[in-house]
């Protein structure tokens, strides 16, 4: 079975680095499924659930992403995400609370920097909620 190297990195940390047999990335054009030896492309990442199929793993590795850039080479996929969180680190109640706090931050922003930070936090919370919804809807 063919494999490819995958790197998922946020501005704060490396989220995933390893091999995968398939990856689905939410892009501005829609979800993009990538197998090893894919044609080289670049795309903008939109918020949603990034899904990795790892050889020998029963479940997909799920990462909530909100924005960023995708680079695909035949043997390597790199995702530079604005915000990325592994599904194991997510919690529904915390994500909902973060969404409410970000929405309040948007309405109370005093300047452009505060507004941008609140929008980034809102996107991260929505990405986590979408990923948690995906997990719930695909439980076996």
Curated annotation (Swiss-Prot):
Its main location: membrane. GO terms for molecular function: ATP binding; proton-transporting ATP synthase activity, rotational mechanism. CDD domains: F1-ATPase_delta. It is a peripheral membrane protein. The keyword Signal does not apply. Keywords: ATP synthesis, Cell inner membrane, Cell membrane, CF(1), Hydrogen ion transport, Ion transport, Membrane, Transport. GO terms for cellular component: plasma membrane; proton-transporting ATP synthase complex. It holds the Pfam family ATP-synt_DE_N. Disulfide bonds: none annotated. It is found in: Cell inner membrane. The keyword Cytoplasm does not apply. It comes from the Bacteria. Belongs to the ATPase epsilon chain family. Produces ATP from ADP in the presence of a proton gradient across the membrane. F-type ATPases have 2 components, CF(1) - the catalytic core - and CF(0) - the membrane proton channel. CF(1) has five subunits: alpha(3), beta(3), gamma(1), delta(1), epsilon(1). CF(0) has three main subunits: a, b and c. This is ATP synthase epsilon chain. The gene is atpC.
